[in-house]
Regions:
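Short glycine-rich or small-residue beta-strand-to-loop segments that form or flank ligand, phosphate
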Residues: 107-108, 162-165
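N-terminal pre-triad scaffold of radical SAM enzymes
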Residues: 45, 90-123
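Conserved aromatic-histidine-acidic binding/catalytic patches
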Residues: 4, 33, 37, 41, ...
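Iron-sulfur (Fe-S) cluster-binding segments and ferredoxin-like electron-carrier domains
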Residues: 120-132
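Short connector loops/turns at beta-strand edges and beta->alpha or beta->beta junctions
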Residues: 114, 123-126, 258, 297
């Protein structure tokens, strides 16, 4: 049940250390503590996610690498790094709406996620303040959303809107309906993409939060009735994230006719070999998820140990 996962979420370093104290050696525990003291993202991991980590070798585990920093692995940040490395705020005509490309916009509707990734490019806004970063606020706000709707409607070239954050998984069902319906009714909007890491880290929500999934299905059906595409974009980075629960959750999207595409980030030690990426793509294909993007890791504070070279991506 997703409510149990949410209730038992680990959102403090001391809670995490207590949860893993019998799973890992003392040296690893102290290394984690040092890691979070230097991290721009707060700790937020689910029991389900912790269960997928290989605790016989947590240092090299591809899921541990993504969510739990180790102080011993930190490398100096790139000299050109900025907290908002993609300059999303600079290209935002209204708060939380980035309009960089002529026909596409990124709509950051919320500033929380089911878990927090170490390599998040939005550490300037997502989650709570840390020792390293004081966040700006992009909390769910209907008045802020209305300003975004007005801007999108005023720009006829805008056809493709990505609803992200934060994470669309954390939207209430009525917010999913409101956001989806409002965007679909704007004449120039032809495509909507809900973006979420949730399916990879908490598939229980799709299986047990029926109101939320019904809202997503209703928005998709409304879009189809008006000749507009509503798709769901998820974020699996390693084959170990694809489980039986993932398959069951993705079957709900498949049965509802909702297209699901995957966006991966190329991460050192996680998926930066042809073999690991090929296996990920194959397993996603088995659960009806279309490979879509593979991003090269951006300049992110405290995550230089995960960034590959551009040549690695080319190869």
């Amino acid at each position: 049940d997703y409510r149990w996962q949410s209730k038992k979420i680990i959102n403090r370093v001391d809670k995490l250390l207590d949860a893993i104290k019998d799973l890992a050696p003392d040296g690893f525990i102290s290394d984690v503590e040092r890691g979070f003291s230097r991290a721009p993202m707060a700790v937020r991991v689910s029991p389900y996610l912790l269960s997928l980590i290989d605790w016989t070798n947590p240092v090299d585990d591809p899921l541990r690498i993504q969510f739990i920093p180790l102080g011993s692995k930190f490398l100096p940040d790139h000299p050109k790094l900025g907290l908002d490395s993609l300059h999303e705020q600079a290209d935002a005509p209204v708060p939380g709406l980035t309009h960089r490309y002529p026909d596409k916009a990124l709509f950051l509707v919320i500033d929380t996620c089911p878990v927090y990734c170490r390599f998040c490019t939005r550490s300037y806004a997502v989650g709570v303040d840390t020792d390293q970063v004081e966040k700006i606020s992009l909390k769910a706000s209907k008045s802020r959303w209305e300003r975004a709707f007005e801007y999108i409607a005023s720009r006829p070239e805008l056809e493709d809107i990505v609803i992200s954050g934060g994470d669309a998984y954390n939207l209430r069902a009525d917010w999913v309906r409101e956001l989806g319906t409002s965007l679909i009714k704007i004449p120039n909007v032809q495509r909507i993409r809900f973006a979420s890491k949730g399916l990879a880290v908490m598939p229980q929500k799709v299986l047990t939060d029926h109101d939320w999934f019904d809202a997503m299905a209703e928005v998709h059906a409304l879009g189809r009735s008006m000749g507009k595409e509503v798709a769901f974009h998820t974020h699996f980075n390693h084959a170990n994230e694809v489980t039986e629960l993932s398959r069951q959750a993705l079957n709900r999207f498949f049965d509802a006719g909702i297209i699901v595409r995957n966006q991966s980030v190329l991460l050192r030690g996680v998926n930066d070999t042809p073999e690991s990426m090929s296996l990920l793509v194959k397993r996603l294909g088995h659960i009806n998820v279309h490979p879509y993007y593979v991003y090269v890791h951006d300049l992110v504070q405290g995550a230089e140990d995960m960034r590959t070279t551009v040549q690695t991506a080319v190869d």
